Swiss-Prot record:
A GO term for molecular function: lysophospholipase activity
Mutation effect (H211A): Abolished palmitoyl thioesterase activity
Organism: Homo sapiens
Any single GO CC term annotated in Swiss-Prot or TrEMBL for this entry: cytoplasm
Protein name: Lysophospholipase-like protein 1
Physiological role: Palmitoyl thioesterase that catalyzes depalmitoylation of CGAS and KCNMA1. Acts as a regulator of innate immunity by mediating depalmitoylation of CGAS, thereby preventing CGAS homodimerization and cyclic GMP-AMP synthase activity. Does not exhibit phospholipase nor triacylglycerol lipase activity, able to hydrolyze only short chain substrates due to its shallow active site.
Entry annotation: catalytic residues: S124, D179, H211
Biological-process GO terms, alphabetical: negative regulation of cGAS/STING signaling pathway; negative regulation of Golgi to plasma membrane protein transport
Residues that bear N-acetylalanine: A2
The reaction(s) this protein catalyses: S-hexadecanoyl-L-cysteinyl-[protein] + H2O = L-cysteinyl-[protein] + hexadecanoate + H(+)
Entry keyword set: Acetylation, Cytoplasm, Hydrolase
InterPro entries linked to this entry: AB_hydrolase_fold (IPR029058), LYPA1-2/EST-like (IPR050565), PLipase/COase/thioEstase (IPR003140)
UniProt superkingdom: Eukaryota
Similarity field: Belongs to the AB hydrolase superfamily. AB hydrolase 2 family.
């Protein structure tokens, strides 16, 4: 199934309150949408996630068949053979979406935002997609975040990093210890592997948090985003 190009990806945008000098691409989990993720975050925080200078882009994955749903159609960034960390990646669909999302990054660059002022991340499958996008294709972005996400054991990301000798973006990772869909141990293993391959990482565990977003997690994420994409006042300090 052909995927849409980045220029026609449906998206929900939260504009900065002031002058736009940085962009954040936040990718939803499987079966969700950009608007759905924005509203979920708003529900958890009791307000929109907003910044003075950062535009937030919540794109929606185009519908495609999804093997874990027995081939049913869902808004997913790529296909999986199954939801586990010990099977091969569906690299063909991942690579198609890397190109689609590269088009979205290119749009921001053409609008005047430098690559080192663009941050990429996501929840669950969205976090996995962000890791592939950044560490295999865009190692010059400001940073990467992955919430309740994991990579498969023989991920193409690990292979790409073995060949890399440049400066890599920092990874901010969060995971609930009570997550029964994406196990906390899978995320820990992902973090350890990336760290061993030269990625600077921050890993936050949240007791009694399932496969979900938490307010504490989002509050910490917001602070980290501001360290990676400071506004004019912060940069001058």
């Amino acid at each position: 199934m052909a995927a849409a190009s980045g220029s026609v990806l449906q998206r929900c945008i939260v504009s900065p309150a002031g002058r736009h000098s940085a962009s954040l691409i936040f990718l939803h989990g499987s079966g969700d949408s950009g608007q759905g993720l924005r509203m979920w975050i708003k529900q958890v925080l009791n307000q929109d996630l907003t910044f003075q200078h950062i535009k937030i882009i919540y794109p929606t994955a185009p519908p495609r068949s999804y093997t874990p749903m027995k081939g049913g159609i869902s808004n997913v960034w790529f296909d999986r053979f199954k939801i586990t960390n010990d099977c091969p990646e569906h690299l063909e669909s991942i690579d198609v979406m890397c190109q689609v999302l590269t088009d979205l990054i290119d749009e921001e660059v053409k609008s005047g935002i430098k690559k080192n002022r663009i941050l990429i991340g996501g929840f669950s499958m969205g976090g996995c997609m962000a890791i592939h996008l950044a560490y295999r294709n865009h190692q010059d972005v400001a940073g990467v975040f992955a919430l309740s996400s994991f990579l498969n054991k023989a991920s193409a990301v690990y292979q790409a990093l073995q060949k890399s000798n440049g400066v890599l973006p920092e990874l901010f990772q969060c995971h609930g210890t009570a997550d029964e869909l994406v196990l906390h141990s899978w995320a820990e293993e992902t973090n350890s592997m990336l760290k061993s391959l030269g990625v600077t990482t921050k890993f936050h565990s949240f007791p009694n948090v399932y496969h979900e977003l938490s307010k504490t997690e989002l509050d910490i994420l917001k602070l980290w985003i501001l360290t990676k994409l400071p506004g004019e006042m912060e940069k001058q300090k």
